[in-house]
């Protein structure tokens, strides 16, 4: 049983966002036993219950006020918003934060041998998709007439099977399109995972848990975006070294025993440190360069 005084979080049960969502909760310090056989799991150390459902059920559970918070892809969220508007259902929700996973794009793709110059080549075409409302919204803005072929899976096989002239589907790397003789021609929607919350009254107790959770999520994301850097640098080149590294704050500078010409520098870099940057540091005389991952971070 889910208790009303506990924060209710809903997330995808299977597929792409499931493992990343679980990892986020674990990194936020939420002790919870999630498994495929259980639809509901209860946190051992926080007043939080987690429901695992189909991804396209998540927006409705939030907008109908059944659960408090959801982790969902923006593509699924926007498609459901458009669908619910047509049905005159409530579409109230608050987007708390875009997350750092679930990156993809909804794109149009055509057979490799199909002549294509611009989007208007698809006028009066039949297009297979799992996102008919997002597709219609995009084509309506372009005043393009089309016929929709609704498929809930294996959209990429539709042209080869003679079901459609083109497809509109999610793309991550493009490898699946290429394997099915298709090429991406137009991005119509860019998506990431996001954290959404229901509107309406939320108890003080639940709001406190939400605030704690948001602080921890921000810390997890910030830590994943940052690296802890330690190196030795010549004092004369110190400012040039610092300029190469974009830090959250000014670095910590320490004297080196028995060497007055060099110092040790420690800092949190807010950007990924590429090999090219490390090579530039080396040219400035830096040595003993260490780049370490950060597990948790709070500013």
Swiss-Prot record:
Pfam families: HisG, HisG_C. GO terms for biological process: L-histidine biosynthetic process. Gene3D superfamilies: 3.30.70.120, Periplasmic binding protein-like II. GO terms for molecular function: ATP binding; ATP phosphoribosyltransferase activity; magnesium ion binding. It is found in: Cytoplasm. Its cofactor is Mg(2+). Its main location: cytoplasm. It comes from the Bacteria. Belongs to the ATP phosphoribosyltransferase family. Long subfamily. NCBIfam families: hisG, HisG_C-term. Catalyzes the condensation of ATP and 5-phosphoribose 1-diphosphate to form N'-(5'-phosphoribosyl)-ATP (PR-ATP). Has a crucial role in the pathway because the rate of histidine biosynthesis seems to be controlled primarily by regulation of HisG enzymatic activity. Equilibrium between an active dimeric form, an inactive hexameric form and higher aggregates. Interconversion between the various forms is largely reversible and is influenced by the natural substrates and inhibitors of the enzyme. This is ATP phosphoribosyltransferase. It comes from Buchnera aphidicola subsp. Melaphis rhois.
């Amino acid at each position: 049983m889910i208790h009303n005084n506990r924060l209710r979080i809903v997330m995808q049960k299977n597929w792409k966002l499931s493992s990343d969502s679980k990892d986020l909760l674990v990194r936020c310090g939420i002790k919870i036993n999630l498994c495929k056989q259980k639809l509901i799991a209860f946190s051992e150390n926080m007043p939080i219950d987690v429901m695992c459902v189909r991804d396209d059920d998540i927006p409705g559970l939030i907008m109908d006020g059944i659960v408090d918070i959801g982790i969902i892809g923006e593509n699924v969220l926007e498609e459901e918003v458009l669908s619910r508007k047509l049905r005159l259902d409530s579409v109230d929700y608050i987007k708390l934060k875009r997350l750092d996973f679930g990156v993809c794009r909804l794109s149009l793709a055509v057979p490799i041998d199909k002549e294509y110059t611009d989007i208007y080549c698809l006028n009066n075409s039949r297009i297979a998709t799992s996102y008919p409302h997002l597709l219609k919204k995009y084509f309506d803005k372009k005043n393009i007439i089309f016929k929709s072929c609704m498929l809930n899976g294996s959209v990429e096989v539709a042209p080869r099977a003679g079901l459609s002239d083109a497809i509109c589907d999610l793309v991550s790397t493009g490898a699946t399109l290429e394997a099915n003789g298709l090429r991406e021609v137009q991005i119509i929607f860019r998506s990431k995972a996001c954290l959404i919350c229901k509107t309406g009254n939320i108890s003080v107790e639940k709001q406190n848990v939400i605030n704690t959770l948001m602080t921890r999520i921000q810390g997890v994301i910030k830590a994943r975006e940052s690296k802890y850097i330690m190196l030795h640098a010549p004092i004369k080149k110190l400012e040039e070294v610092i300029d190469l590294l974009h830090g959250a704050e000014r670095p910590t500078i320490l004297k080196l025993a028995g060497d007055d010409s060099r110092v040790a520098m420690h800092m949190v870099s807010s950007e990924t440190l590429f090999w090219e940057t490390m090579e530039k540091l080396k040219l400035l005389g830096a040595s003993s360069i260490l780049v370490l991952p950060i597990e948790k971070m709070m500013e």
